[in-house]
Amino acid sequence: MGSSLSEPCIYDKLSESIDILRQSGYRYGMSEREIEKFIKQVLETNEPRREPPQFPILRATVKFVVAVGVVLMAVLVFTYPQSPVLMGSVSGTTLNNSSPLSHIRLLELPIAEKYNLHGFHEWWASSSLQTMDLNCSACTDVTDILELTDQLRTSAGEHTRTQPLLLKGGAALSLRVSQMDQFSSVSQTPANFTLLWSVSSRPRESVLQWLFPESERCPLLEIWSSTLQRCRLSSRRPQPSRVQVLGWMVVADGSPDVRLLPVQRCRKHCRSFSLRLEPGDMVFADSQIWLMELSPSGAQDVQCDSAVL
């Protein structure tokens, strides 16, 4: 159809070829049957052969990608938020957006009853709730901070690790931290308060022995390492930096404000606390659940020097 009129049609060429073969058969005295057989053999012998496909791996890959795309499109067609009727048929306590079935219409199809997809949906939701309880249930019941004064050893033994602990060490503990500060090699810059808190890269034996000559007096500290820093209050910058502490912290002098916050995953389930600390106060909080944040009041900012110890 698209070829020009001057180009001979393929059928015309084939007809001419058959006429030539037929005339050749007549010339050599062949019968009509022999001529037909001869023409058939010639046409079969000269039939064009298909070449093997090029790039077979590429072709197979393209077919696979197309098939996957079709399947995904089919899934997307059935994907949309559950209808109110469906949400009413499933218990509200078992619904969970993280379930792979929570936004798919499979739960409305007969196949859901055959393969118990509703049971899978409920199992997924319940397991997700159990994971939340495992991570944050330890702090959901914490309503206050346990304060210890004289009966340190007895109270600490009854203390659960998930409850923040305020230890009123008084002047003796404040003096020990101040002496550590005086013996340090760092230049003594003006400071509003001095803090001792935990890090994982510092040895703990010498620090704990200095602060607590009776090592069994506070067994909660035996697993923590420590460092000493001097902090001061300054005018607040446009974007004040937050100073966060993990584990435990001792105040040598000054009266900083400290907030105890649940870790990010537990902030919807656990409450936070605020403390005004005094010299000799020590705060302990499990770093897997809590973090401490220095929060000065007013238009001020906290800036801490590098570690002294």
UniProtKB/Swiss-Prot annotation:
Its biological purpose: Exhibits histone deacetylase (HDAC) enhancer properties. May play a role in progression through the cell cycle.
Indicate where this protein is primarily found: Golgi
Keyword Transmembrane among record annotations: yes
Record topology, Extracellular segments: 81-309
Q: Which UniProt keywords apply?
A: Cytoplasm, Golgi apparatus, Membrane, Signal-anchor, Transmembrane, Transmembrane helix
Q: Where are the transmembrane segments?
A: 60-80
Q: Give the originating organism.
A: Danio rerio (Zebrafish)
Q: Name one GO cellular component term.
A: plasma membrane
Q: Which residues lie on this side of the membrane: Cytoplasmic?
A: 1-59
Q: Does the keyword Hydrolase apply?
A: no
List localization entries: Golgi apparatus membrane; Cytoplasm
An example GO biological process term is: chromatin remodeling
InterPro entries for this protein? BRAP (IPR038757)
| Protein's name according to its UniProt entry | Bombesin receptor-activated protein C6orf89 homolog
Its quaternary organisation is: Homodimer.
- List the membrane topology term(s): Single-pass type II membrane protein
